[in-house]
Amino acid sequence: PAGVTKLFVEAWGGGGGGAAGGGGGGGGYAATEWTVTPGAAVAINIGEGGEGASTPAGDGENAGNTTVTIGAIVLTAYGGQGAYAGSGGFGGRFNVNSGALMPYGQSGAAGESSREVYGAYSSTIFYTAVTYGKGGMAGNTSIENSNGGFRSVNNSSLVNIKLIYGKNGTEPGGGGGGDGTGISGNYGGPGLVIIHY
């Protein structure tokens, strides 16, 4: 806007997609104070959340990075990593490509890994239960994901005893919940940019 010479910019990357191994990583957070010329163009790219694994043995997708660009300077909040078939994804980080700015940032939290336990209903009926990990929180947020799925299976018949699908990550940048079905989606949450002036 006319007359504005300073901006305070906050950015969050997208959250990684979930998988059987756990939740996706949370998006990174980046913030900085920016001295600008009134009327300067600001280019913003919001990172998309990663898609969850499409098969029980597949990996979740990495999330997109969120960038804010003014002139040649780019502030980046990196997207979270998608979960693997065997573990949760790592959180995203942050960066600025110029020493002219002093950025503050916080990495996103890693997605929680899934946990498997075994038990018995009787001397002849045994089961396997998996608590799929929740997605990691984005950096500098207090919005916790509670989106991991759950599955218990009769080991003899392989019939589901109980099934709860993983859910999408919260906005901004929450990782998608863990899920071993490959059909629930469990996307990471999208990124976000807030500009204060």
Regions found by a protein language model. Give the residues of each.
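Extended alpha-helical scaffolds used as interaction platforms
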Residues: 170-174
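Glycine-rich strand-loop-strand elements at beta-sheet edges
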Residues: 11-70, 89-95, 142, 147-156, ...
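Beta-rich globular "head" domains
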Residues: 1-18, 126-129, 133-137, 194
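Phosphate/pyrophosphate- and phosphate-bearing ligand-binding catalytic cores of soluble enzymes
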Residues: 122, 130-133, 141-145
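A short, structured loop/turn motif at beta-sheet edges
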Residues: 4, 36-41, 70-74, 164-166
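Acidic, low-complexity glycine/serine/threonine-rich segments
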Residues: 50-113, 119
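Terminal beta-strand-rich extracellular "head" domains
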Residues: 23-24, 72-83, 98-108, 126-129, ...
